[in-house]
Regions:
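Extracytoplasmic/lumenal domain signature
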Residues: 1-27, 32-82, 86-114
Length: 114
């Protein structure tokens, strides 16, 4: 089975051409978008940013790994499911770790910005 990331034109309800291959087949969480960029978390722990216009992969960050934290406690990320990324003040926020439905456990809040 081939998986694809596709944009849909709302008025006719048809996919834009061409569809992009290679997205994760397990992207159950809510999408988050800003002008020209769509963020998608997946069960493999990756947070990906796609160009809204053509679906091109712009950025990919693996959250399913150990992290040093500001309070010195080790934390581990996992699957990204449920709520999507929150975008505010030029930053993107996610919580990594979701053990339900076969996901990878963890519990680490992450913030991305310039």
């Amino acid at each position: 089975m081939k998986h694809r990331l596709a944009a849909v034109l709302l008025a006719p309800g048809k996919p834009c051409d061409p569809p992009r291959l290679g997205c994760s087949p397990a992207q159950p969480g809510a999408l988050a978008a800003i002008p020209a960029v769509v963020f998608s978390g997946s069960m493999d722990g990756h947070l990906r940013a796609f160009a809204a216009g053509d679906g091109k992969l712009l950025w990919d960050f693996d959250t399913a790994k150990p992290f040093d934290t500001v309070n010195g406690v080790n934390a581990t990320g996992g699957s990204l499911d449920g709520a999507g990324a929150v975008i505010s003040g030029g930053m993107v926020f996610v919580n990594s770790g979701y053990p339900r439905f076969g996901g990878m456990p963890g519990n680490v809040p992450l913030a991305f910005g310039n």
